[in-house]
Amino acid sequence: MQYSSRFYISWLASAILMYASFVGWHGFFLNDLSYITFSKPLFFGLAGFVYLVISYVLYRVYEAKIFDRYFYSAVLRGVTAGFIIGVILFAIIAVLGISFTKHVNTTYLLADCLWQIAEQTIGGVVIGFGKLFLFEVRSEADYGD
């Protein structure tokens, strides 16, 4: 499978913006990055890699053929893909991480769910704008799937 420059630009821009919003939310608003007990450069490096993977999966969900029937707007398609990935990530995080933490209440879970949806929706919108505004000389269909 070959990818176009539209893919790479949208993928990287989405990952960078989601990573920046992650750092803003957890580093400045919640200030819970200060509780990390191991190497911060290692943590941020791994987080960067994770956001590259999340952005790739988000792009692939955005490109799902089933969306062709229901969404003609690139941005609405990005919002929908971001919502789906946000809910899935919240479920994974809730099962693997939050469930082992003490003092987690419903308000915290709701806020975390809404944040995951918002963060991934930001990434989906960036991908949608990339698909909308980045010009490709060759059609992406020429690259195959």
Give the role of each language-model region.
Residues 1-145:
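Juxtamembrane/disordered regions of integral membrane proteins
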